[in-house]
Amino acid sequence: IFVNKAKFVETDEQFILPEPLSDPIIEKLVKRRTAETYEVKAGEYIQIIDPGGRQCSDFLAFDTHKLKDGIESIIDDKATRTFMGSAYPGPGLFSKFYDSDHAAMVEVVRDTVGRHDTFNLACTAKYYEDMGYMGHINCTDNFNKGLKKYDINSRKSWSAINLFFNTAIDANNVATFDEPWSRPGDYVLFKALKD
């Protein structure tokens, strides 16, 4: 079997965003292989859009008040799965992402895809090196660079929420990965529950 993949050519047309759900306070286009940081207050909304379809986006959230006290508290995938009773939250009753102190950080208000990943780390240098791609740009290094301005310690890996990443556990208890389900313009809308 031979598989021919199309070459990705980045053009401005691929990054035309759909109309926002409300007037944006901040609008950022995160180009592939990069990371952006931004601050929100409790009660504000975060809309993460896949403008091109079949892309993935790693998401971290910190509690600003804990950061001021020197505590780097981020979304905890294990706590979230435990409290929600599912692989990842969705709109409705079981809609929150929690930190390791069991505090709700963000709530899923709307999700047009319905398939994400809370089992895997954000991609790392080791992940790519093990596949033979030395020096490959990776999410962990991008996070480390972007978070320096907040005096957040660098890590070898980040336990991020991998939005639009199509991960499942099969009948043999094996993690499977497949093409993302997201189409151009699909999004997840979060409500911040912490600054």
Residue ranges with predicted function:
Residues 1-195:
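Acidic, Ser/Thr/Pro
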